[in-house]
Design a protein with these regions (language model features):
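Residues that flank catalytic or metal-binding motifs in active/ligand-binding sites
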Residues: 166, 222, 232
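Flexible, glycine/small-residue-enriched loop-and-beta-strand segment within the central core
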Residues: 84-93, 98-212, 239, 247-252
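Short hydrophobic beta-strand segments in globular cytosolic domains
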Residues: 203, 209, 221, 226-227
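Short acidic/histidine- and often glycine-rich active-site loop of Leloir-type glycosyltransferases
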Residues: 179, 228-229
C-alpha cells in the first residue's frame, strides 16, 4: 500500500504535467476517473445544472441525478448545494444519508475501492472525505460535524454510531522524509491507516494521526492529538492524547 500511495501521488503530478496530454484529458483523469466522452459529458451536465441550485428544487434535482454518477446509492439520500464528487463511480452510499452543503467526496485512485458510506450517516457542512489510492469506510449512523476531514492513503474506517464534532482531522497518511538528499515531493507518501471502533465520541478539533487504532466506546476530548492506540471505553485528552479514566468504572 505504501508503494501504491507513492505511485499515485507521483502519477497525478506527472499526468498533469505531460505535454502530450490535453488539459481536458488531465481534468477527466483527475476528476471523473474514467475514460470516455459520454462519462465526461454526463458528469459535467449533472454538476452544471444541479450542484449549486439552492433550496428544495436543488435537493430534489441532486437526489435524482447525483446517484447516476455513483457506484451505488440507497434511498432518501440528500445532497446539499455545491457537493463535489470526484471519481464518483467509486462512491457507495446507503439509505437515509445527509451530505450537507460544500462537502467534497474524493475517491480518487488507480486500484482502490474508494468511499463507502453506511446508512443513516450525516456529513456536516464543508467536510471532506479524501482518498489518495486509499479507502474510507463510514459505518452506519456515523455523524461528522462541519469542517472536518478524513484523509486516507490506505484504509480509514470509522465504526457505527460514532460522533465526530466540528474541525476534526483523521490523517490516514504521512509524507516520507527519510532521504535528506531528495525533495519531499520526490519521496512520496506512506500510510498505515486508522481504525475507529463503534460508538466513539471525538470532541471538537481532535486530530487522529496515521497508524492509530481507537477502541469501541472511547471518548477523545476536544483538541486532543491521538498518536497511538486507544483502548475500549477509554477517556483520553491532551497533546499527545493520554488515558485519564475508564468509562465503565471511572478509574484510571
Amino acid at each position: 500500500m505504501l508503494d501504491a500511495m507513492k505511485t499515485e501521488s507521483v502519477r497525478i503530478q506527472q499526468e498533469m504535467a505531460k505535454e502530450s496530454k490535453s488539459s481536458l484529458a488531465g481534468y477527466q483523469d483527475l476528476i471523473v476517473g474514467q475514460a470516455g466522452w459520454w462519462l465526461l459529458l454526463k458528469y459535467e451536465l449533472i454538476m452544471l445544472f444541479c450542484s449549486i441550485i439552492p433550496g428544495a428544487l436543488g435537493l430534489l434535482l441532486r437526489s435524482i441525478f447525483y446517484p447516476c454518477l455513483l457506484g451505488s446509492c440507497g434511498k432518501k439520500v440528500y445532497f446539499g448545494a455545491n457537493v463535489v464528487l470526484r471519481h464518483p463511480h467509486k462512491i457507495k452510499i446507503g439509505d437515509n444519508v445527509i451530505i450537507d452543503d460544500n462537502c467534497l467526496l474524493d475517491a480518487k485512485g488507480r486500484d482502490n475501492d474508494g468511499i463507502t458510506i453506511g446508512s443513516g450517516v450525516f456529513l456536516g457542512r464543508n467536510s471532506i472525505l479524501s482518498c489518495k489510492n486509499g479507502d474510507i469506510v463510514l459505518r452506519d449512523r456515523v455523524n461528522i460535524g462541519f469542517n472536518s476531514e478524513v484523509f486516507s492513503g490506505s484504509r480509514v474506517e470509522i465504526g457505527s454510531d460514532t460522533l465526530v464534532a466540528a474541525y476534526c482531522y483523521f490523517v490516514g497518511g504521512d509524507h516520507a522524509a527519510d532521504d535528506v538528499e531528495k525533495g519531499l515531493t520526490e519521496q512520496g507518501s506512506r500510510s498505515a491507516g486508522i481504525t475507529v471502533g463503534a460508538n466513539c465520541w471525538f470532541g471538537a478539533g481532535v486530530i487522529v494521526l496515521d497508524g492509530t487504532s481507537i477502541g469501541a466506546n472511547a471518548i477523545i476530548g476536544a483538541g486532543a492529538v491521538v498518536t497511538k492506540g486507544v483502548a475500549d471505553y477509554s477517556v483520553s485528552i491532551g497533546v499527545p492524547a493520554r488515558h485519564v479514566r475508564d468509562r465503565r468504572n471511572g478509574q484510571p
